From Swiss-Prot:
HAMAP family the record matches: GMP_synthase
Keywords: ATP-binding, Glutamine amidotransferase, GMP biosynthesis, Ligase, Nucleotide-binding, Purine biosynthesis
Protein name per Swiss-Prot or TrEMBL: GMP synthase [glutamine-hydrolyzing]
Summary of the function given for this chain in its UniProt record: Catalyzes the synthesis of GMP from XMP.
Protein species of origin: Listeria monocytogenes serovar 1/2a (strain ATCC BAA-679 / EGD-e)
Chain ranges of the GMPS ATP-PPase domain: 204-393
Record-level Gene Ontology MF annotations: ATP binding; GMP synthase activity
């Protein structure tokens, strides 16, 4: 399988080096909020590879290692000599310190949580910010001696050297995590680094992104044909419109009705994308094929792999009926790739767009959105002229309801999730909350409980309502839905959906949980 990669060498950008922190993806997202393109790369990148990327600035992320661990993550030390601004965060600051001859030691007690800092010596990084701030700390080591040529810029009660700077060489380090929202002025600090220190213009927009992508798709595809893995969700729909704008009828959308879609979704997909956008769509009824393969399967990873494989096999079947097809398009997002793991971060769960793909797949893979976060995809959809009904559609995973039915999938369980999810979406819309809640859906855990309905005892299914608020999907908080709305949802589900006698509301944030249950 051959993946088409992007080339943003001409775009001003800040490169984030991944040293394994659970927060490092947030750094990339925050930088983009300032109109500056940013990418995450493994810490193993060489100085030659870094120069080829032509970055405007570099950020060293945090990480779980001690700089003195034998197997600690290191960077190519020549990167420090490139003569461009570098910001080291937490572990990144400690790496910078040891590289330039400073001293790092184990802290007596690991510091984790909110902390008060004092800016001793304001500089370009702290321009316009208060001298006293609340930040988020997460470290087991600390700097006890700054390197020659650096000044101590920030202190805290438990961390006397919480920030260092060499203004002349534009080298900065902070022990805290500005990318985490608990750091009250963290966004402003990162903005100062991007705009003040690195001198970025902040002119990266979805308009120029779409222009670059359309031109790149045209260049890569030429006169060949593309198949799109169309699910009807936001991501694949935006991919479809983007590619259709680039190559028109050279795009054929394969819409697989695998029997794992939401209520009425198959018809809506055909009416909207084929009717309004005049896209070439082949609908494949593969319900029985998928259900046969999933029979008796309970493990979530196995379900994902089966669904991913069957999708590709269906595309292979359809592609064999077409001439000149060389490319397969997918709606893979940056968060999908992140959650599936990088060289330095543990896999959380394999994602449907990056896991389960056969190695001998016959297509070249195009993923135009694989550098974008969800909110950026919505902004791109709006830029492309797509209606709000599509752009603001609830996120829906490629495996569909297959990962919202926990355990073995049956037709009865699918109907329960379809009907309960439809009720949830109706009531959220009736309450005017559809734009306030980032994602909401129902899931069916493999749980039955005792209940009383009418004059009889029941032993039926429990439905979970999941609703979260988020900006980019990297972190999420459970949505504070008004009690009266939750009551309506619960009453309707129990009364209108067969074989359900209990509704529970999931109030777990991400992390520690993921948004989906599987």
């Amino acid at each position: 399988m051959f993946k088409i990669m992007k080339d943003f060498t001409e775009q001003e950008k800040i490169i984030v080096l991944d040293f394994g922190s659970q927060y490092n993806q947030l750094i990339t997202r925050r930088i983009r909020e300032f109109g500056v393109y940013s990418e995450l790369h493994p810490h193993t990148i060489t100085v030659e590879e870094m120069k080829a990327l032509n970055p405007t600035g570099i950020i060293f992320s945090g990480g779980p290692n001690s700089v003195y661990d034998e197997d600690a993550f290191r960077a190519d030390e020549r990167i420090f000599d490139m003569g461009i601004p570098i910001l080291g965060i937490c572990y990144g600051m400690q790496l910078m310190t040891t590289h330039f001859g400073g001293k790092v030691e184990r802290a007596k007690d690991r510091e984790y949580g909110k902390a008060d800092i004092h800016v001793e010596k304001p500089n370009r990084l702290f321009a316009g910010l208060p001298t006293d701030q609340v930040v988020w700390m997460s470290h087991g080591d600390l700097v006890v001696e700054e390197p020659a040529g650096f000044e101590v810029t920030v202190t805290s009660k438990s961390c006397p050297i919480a920030g260092i700077a060499d203004e002349e060489r534009s080298l900065y380090g902070v022990q805290f995590h500005p990318e985490v929202r608990h750091s009250v002025y963290g966004n402003e600090l990162l903005k100062n680094f991007a705009l003040n220190v690195c001198g970025c213009k902040g002119d990266w927009t979805m308009e120029n992104f779409s222009e670059v992508e359309i031109a790149k798709i045209q260049e890569i595809v030429g006169d060949k044909k593309v198949l799109l893995a169309l699910s009807g969700g936001v991501d694949s729909s935006v991919v479809g419109v983007l590619i259709h704008k680039a190559i028109g009828d050279q795009l054929t959308c394969i819409f697989v009705d695998h029997g794992l879609l939401r209520k009425g979704e198959a018809d809506q997909v055909m009416e909207t994308l084929q009717g309004e956008f005049n896209m070439n769509i082949i609908k494949v009824d593969a319900k029985k094929r998928f259900m046969d393969k999933l029979a008796g399967v309970s493990d979530p990873e196995q379900k994902r792999k089966i669904i991913g494989n069957e999708f590709i096999y269906v595309f292979d079947d359809e592609a064999n009926k077409l001439d000149g097809v060389e490319f397969l398009a997918q709606g893979t997002l940056y968060t999908d790739i992140i959650e599936s793991g990088t060289a330095t971060a543990q896999t959380i769960k394999s994602h449907h767009n990056v896991g389960g793909l056969p190695e001998d797949m016959q297509f070249k893979l195009i993923e135009p959105l694989n550098t974008l976060f969800k909110d950026e995809v919505r902004a791109l959809g709006t830029e492309l002229g797509m209606p709000d009904a599509i752009v603001w559609r609830q996120p829906f995973p490629g495996p569909g309801l297959g990962i919202r039915v926990l355990g073995e999938i049956t037709e009865e369980k699918l109907e329960i999730v379809r009907d309960s999810d439809y009720i949830l979406r109706e009531e959220i819309k009736n309450a005017g909350l559809e734009r306030e809640i980032w994602q909401y859906f129902t899931a069916l855990p493999n749980i039955r409980s005792v209940g009383v309905m009418g004059d009889g005892r029941t032993y039926d299914h429990t439905v979970v309502v999941r609703a979260v608020t988020s900006i980019d999907g990297m972190t999420a908080d459970w949505a504070r839905i008004p009690w009266d709305v939750l009551e309506k949802i619960s009453v309707r589900i129990v009364n209108e959906v067969d074989h359900v006698n209990r509704v529970v509301y999931d109030i777990t944030s991400k992390p520690p949980a993921t948004v989906e249950w599987e």
